[in-house]
Amino acid sequence: VDTCADDGSPGSLRAQVTAAASGDLIDLSQLTCSTITLANSAIMVTQPSLTLQGRGPEALTIDGAGHYSAFYHLGAGTLGIADVTIANGYYAGSFEPKGGCIFSKGNVFLFHSVVTHCTVGSLSASEPAIGGGVYAEGNLTMKNSTITESHVLASVNGPNAFGGGGYVIGSVAMLYSTISNNTATQFFGANVGDGGGLFVKGAVDITYSTISGNSADYVGGLEIFSNQPATIFNGTISGNVGKLGYGGLWTKSALTISNSTIAFNAARSDASGTSTAGLHSLAPLVLQSSIIADNIGPNGPSDLGGMAGISITGDNNLITSYTLPPPMNTRSECPHLQPLADNGGSTRTHELSHTSVAIDHGSNPLTLQKDQRFATRDVGAATDIGSVEWQPGETDERLFVAGFDGLCDQ
């Protein structure tokens, strides 16, 4: 590709994609311009597999101009996006209102890329708005990537909307990645939105990653609507809001969480009184050395809950409130978490204050060498509980930033 113009000329991105064979790499790394603005429609990718290689998400943006989705992938293979920002995709209609920036009949692989400011709205009485940032009928893999500021809007007279950041029918694998500030919500006060950050119907593997600041009517952060296994380790789920119920994480899949933090999520209103602000599960849980705290429901602290009678095993956790029996050796003191911040590494995390009872009271079942921000694990007498290992010399100054006051610190 040798031009940022979307004019169909031989060196344009659209022309190069049309001419490519399956498995080809489209090289955008030599472009000196910063933005390719789509002029007429989404770029159709009919090949089973294709990869786009840019020169960095801060250096090159493919812009839907607020009128079109950026890519419409019809192949059953993988659409790879590397070192690119995909932005300002928009689709509002009645035919397949899916994938505000990326629509794929196959798999999507994001490497060192950003998907941002994408929107899907349904104008159909039967078709839901799905996947504000990304819609994938196969798998979504994210490495050092971010999906942010994307939205789905429920139709006035139609079904709910699902997956503000993304909707994935296959599996999701996140490594060193972030899903943040996405929404799934009502359109003119009609139906509701589910899964503000991510809605997944397959297996889930989240490592060294953060899901934060997302919101929906139900399940602000991550909704796992699957019977396949799910795992989270060295992960953070924080600051997600379910306006009508379920804040951080809702799962019907058997879930294992290790060395992770689920905190400061909220469920603002719940007429039934059965939803949970932090982690709500309908299936067996294994919880290892994780913090679930400072989550708040309409009636107060709300950290761990779900369907009565499910198996919950593990040890060395810190869970401050629960409606289901927690695993053995669970502490319930305040963890004294600092605000979500850039503490090093690829994703934002919650550091521990130096007085936290989480320090030296955890375990390391996966023998991790690093914490979420890639600092050394197992500093001191034992592993710390949660996604971040306290390091000697770290201060607690962020505890006193304006407007920050953890629920259990009050």
Segments predicted by a language model, with ranges:
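Ser/Thr-rich, Pro/Gly/Ala-heavy low-complexity intrinsically disordered linkers and tails
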Residues: G195, G221, D396-G406
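Glycine-centric low-complexity/flexibility signal
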Residues: Y91-G99, T119-Y135, V152-G163, T183, ...
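Short, solvent-exposed mixed-charge patches
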Residues: C408-Q410
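Generic short beta-strand segments
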Residues: L31-T32, A87-N88, H117-T119, H151, ...
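Predominantly extracellular beta-rich ligand-binding scaffolds that present long acidic/polar faces
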Residues: S104-V115, S126, A136-E149, V168-D194, ...
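N-terminal, post-signal-peptide segments of secreted/periplasmic proteins
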Residues: V1-G106, S269-T274, S281-D396
